[in-house]
Amino acid sequence: MNKNYKVVFSKARGALMVVNELTSSVQAKGTKTVIAGAVASLVAGGAMAAEPSLNGGVFNWDGAESRTSTSIYASDKQVSSVPTYANVTEVNITDGSFKPVYGSALAFAGTQKITIKNSTISGAQNSALFLNGHKGNSNVTADGFSNSIVVLDNVTIKDNQSSAGGGLYMYGKAEMTVNSGSFEGNKALSNKKNDQAYGGAAVVKSGKVFFKDVLFKDNVAEASNGYATGGAVLVDITTSIKENGKDSVGDVTFKITKDMTYTGNNV
């Protein structure tokens, strides 16, 4: 049933109130006094950010606003760190805004189906997206588990940094498709002596990535006391992941179906 509501100022409460018009009276000076019905204080800052849900291994997060680093791992993860969310087989993130104050924005490991749509990731200090199924420097045989399937639709990855990666760091058994969106202003930085900064927009150390109509702009790799490689996308063929007895090296494909200009990607 439709109802009419009016916003008034309550001197007694010192705040704005939402008042049910059908159950209110008016004092002589025109101030509404609530007798019964729906009343709610208007809180400055708007609605609370949407919370993620995890049910039966399926992780859903619509309208996310996050300022922390979130790790989401499957049960067959090949890393030892404890995740924010465990035993996740499917991830669906839509209309998100991620600005972590430390670390990566989103980290994934293990066999998962991951879909991120219409989202922005910025300000991360250890790459925006981190897909890592690798156990440090040890060899991993990937024959026993399936690929992760990753889809990014209209995702903006900008102003992130790391010594390796910048926007994206991928070192696992995965197939990724990136449709539209952009990588802008991401940096691979290193100030350590004889150290390497590699990446800028992305590092693909294993797995397959297909970029379709994705903009790359002003991504850089810089090393003040060492050396830098990359600029936009760096495909690193040194890997400790093996499949069918062979090194599982990175494989990247670009497809352009419209006019695009790539500028400012430098080492």
How would you describe each model-predicted region?
Residues P52-Y102, L106-N126, L131-Q161, Y169-K193, ...:
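Surface-exposed loop/turn motifs in large extracellular/passenger domains
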Residues V8-A49:
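Gram-negative bacterial Sec-dependent N-terminal signal peptides
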Residues M1-K6:
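Short acidic, Pro/Gly- and aromatic-enriched capping/linker segments at domain boundaries
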